[in-house]
Regions:
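N-terminal catalytic or cofactor-binding beta/alpha core of small enzyme domains
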Residues: 1-111, 117-127
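Catalytic cores of processing enzymes, dominated by hydrolases/peptidases
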Residues: 120-176
Length: 176
């Protein structure tokens, strides 16, 4: 469930959602940090779930705290980031995926981008990260298959290396 930092009503309808998954390493987390800091995203709240591990970090500007599941929005580009920095509690992944799926459907996002690492190594070089971090597009329609990636949200955690080849890099999200 989305918890806003302010009392104003926030609608995600017709915006795109960006989130990441990573089996090992933190190149995807680094990519999200680059996206946020280089594209004027602002923190608008967080995703509350009992399934998420607790974590608190300083914001990049050092002026506020950020939680596991923080939401960031770039209104001009109609992009929203869900930053799952602390991970999901052990044995609660299925429940979390169900909660997240329901939230995404209820929020009426127009597109969903899953950022996943194609490398198991930690990479901190910006140019290398741009080559290793791929974007996967998901549809809420289980019958729609886009670029032979995944059919629906629950399949996001079953991506093979073959499906990762030749996909969009994170920089391509910001080409106009």
């Amino acid at each position: 469930m989305f918890k806003s930092k302010t009392s104003e009503k926030i609608s995600f309808e017709n915006t795109s959602l960006i989130l990441f998954f990573s089996g090992k390493g933190n190149s995807t987390s680094f990519a999200l940090s680059l996206l946020r800091s280089n594209n004027n995203f602002k923190n608008i709240g967080y995703f509350y779930s009992e399934c998420l591990s607790s974590s608190v970090n300083y914001s990049s500007d050092g002026k506020s705290l950020e939680f596991n599941g923080s939401f960031y929005i770039n209104e001009s580009k109609k992009l929203t980031i869900l930053d799952l920095t602390g991970g999901v509690k052990s044995r609660e992944l299925n429940d979390f995926v169900d909660e997240l799926t329901k939230f995404i459907k209820d929020s009426k996002f127009s597109k969903i981008y899953i950022i996943g690492s194609s490398s198991k190594d930690n990479v901190f070089d910006v140019d290398l990260v741009s080559k290793l971090v791929n974007i996967y597009y998901l549809s809420n329609d289980p019958n729609e298959k886009i670029n032979c990636n995944m059919k629906n949200i629950k399949e996001a955690f079953k991506v093979t290396d073959e499906e990762r080849k030749g996909k969009t890099y994170y920089r391509d999200l910001f080409k106009n």
